[in-house]
Regions:
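Short pre-catalytic strand/loop immediately N-terminal to key active-site residues, enriched for Gly-Thr
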Residues: 11-17, 202-216
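N-terminal beta1-alpha1 ligand-phosphate binding loop
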Residues: 10-23, 223
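Glycine-rich beta-alpha junction loops
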Residues: 42-44, 87, 113-115, 147, ...
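Short, conserved phosphate/pyrophosphate- and ester-handling motifs at nucleotide-, phospho-/glycolipid
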Residues: 21, 144, 218
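Short glycine-enriched, charge-decorated loop/helix-capping segments at active-site entrances
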Residues: 51-58, 119-125, 153-158, 210
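Conserved N-terminal subdomain of the carbohydrate kinase-like
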Residues: 2-10, 22, 26-118
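Conserved phosphate/ATP/ADP-binding segment of small-molecule kinases
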Residues: 124-201, 236
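Short, small-residue alpha-helix embedded
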Residues: 149-150, 212-235, 239
Length: 239
């Protein structure tokens, strides 16, 4: 590996089909010329017999810690970290401790707030832990429409103006950069996201490609943002 090669660390789950999670992160990093390291947090396999619900197996927190420790020790410097699915308060706790220990300069949080098939009570505990323990360490957060609504405390987000307000509210919680993703859900014929950094509110809009919702699209975008930041791009340019 050349001395100029940038390193990105994905702290995320393994998704067996390869369409999301750490597999997608590593593939996206490589496509953009960034070397990817991983710390797997859980193993997810879709259940084709029960409406594709998530069969979710968490990885022992000590093993997660050991993976992060190894990645940092081997590479010496991590240019950017992308955090995906964590899944349990225990996992969130060990990842938060690692963020406090290593003080990574660039942390992109793709806040997976719900796992299909997860019990509502467990999901709420996980969401609250993510908000209190990991969100304060993020330099950039990339919530989808549902996650933007939850993190901002808004009842609904159905317009660009409401999405902008959601981004403002998340920024006000201490996150320097927010990329709130509506994608194609506003039925504008475009993929539409909003970027906010406390002063600049930018609506990012391009023609939509296809009409079906695709698993892993959010992972791919967040991983691409992470890779571009690792390469030295500004958060807005990366978005």
């Amino acid at each position: 590996m050349g001395s100029m090669t940038k390193i990105a660390l994905s702290i995320a789950g393994s998704e067996a089909s390869g369409g999301a999670g750490a597999q997608t992160d590593i593939r996206t990093f490589a496509q953009l010329g960034v070397f990817g390291a991983t710390s797997l947090t859980c193993i997810v396999s879709f259940d084709p017999h029960h409406d594709w619900s998530h069969r979710f197996v968490p990885i022992d927190p000590q093993v997660i810690h050991d993976q992060i420790e190894a990645a940092v020790a081997v590479h010496g410097h991590i240019d950017a970290v992308k955090i995906g699915m964590l899944g349990t308060p225990a996992t969130i706790g060990v990842v938060a401790e690692a963020l406090e220990q290593y003080r990574f300069e660039q942390v992109v949080l793709d806040p997976v707030l719900i796992c299909k098939g997860q019990e509502p009570g467990a999901a709420l505990d996980t969401d609250n832990a993510l908000r209190s323990r990991v969100l304060p360490h993020a330099t950039m957060v990339t919530p989808n429409l549902f996650e933007t609504r939850v993190l901002s405390g808004m009842d609904e987000i159905t317009t660009v103006e409401q999405l902008e307000e959601g981004a403002r509210r998340i920024h006000d919680q201490g996150v320097p950069y927010v990329l709130a993703k509506a994608g194609t859900l506003f039925d504008t014929g475009t993929a539409l996201d909003v970027f906010y950094d406390g002063s600049t509110m930018e609506v990012l809009e391009v023609p939509a490609i296809g009409h079906e919702r695709v698993s892993g699209a959010g992972c791919t975008l967040a991983a691409a943002v992470t890779a571009e930041i690792a390469r030295g791009a500004s958060p807005l340019d990366a978005a």
